[in-house]
């Protein structure tokens, strides 16, 4: 399966717009473009029962973040602090940058 074009990147602040975590914000820890999913810090936490192994000698119940579908998150603009859609703009030097469609502010520094 081909990797999907992602509208968010690692370390972006996002807001969940659908699902049980709707309305919560967090920072993206990992992007999985092959599956079209993102892992957001301290959101969508699940419990996994693990056996003792070399890494985790104790075993037991471990809480970790599960991936969310990328379509369920919206990038939060740093200027207007609102979830927004993004556009791509080509600068004079030929580099591409993302911008907020609500306040027209550049998102990539």
Curated annotation (Swiss-Prot):
Q: Which Gene3D superfamilies does the record associate with it?
A: 2.30.30.30
- A Pfam match: KOW
Record flagged with keyword Glycoprotein: no
Gene Ontology cellular-component terms for this entry are: ribonucleoprotein complex; ribosome
Q: Which InterPro entries match?
A: KOW, Rib_uL2_dom2, Ribosomal_uL24, Ribosomal_uL24_CS, Ribosomal_uL24_KOW, Translation_prot_SH3-like_sf
Gene Ontology molecular function: rRNA binding; structural constituent of ribosome
Q: Which GO terms describe its biological process?
A: translation
State the PANTHER family in the record: MITOCHONDRIAL RIBOSOMAL PROTEIN L24 (PTHR12903)
Family assignment? Belongs to the universal ribosomal protein uL24 family.
Biological role stated in the UniProt entry: One of two assembly initiator proteins, it binds directly to the 5'-end of the 23S rRNA, where it nucleates assembly of the 50S subunit.
- Can you say what this protein is called? Large ribosomal subunit protein uL24
Give the originating organism.
Answer: Syntrophotalea carbinolica (strain DSM 2380 / NBRC 103641 / GraBd1) (Pelobacter carbinolicus)
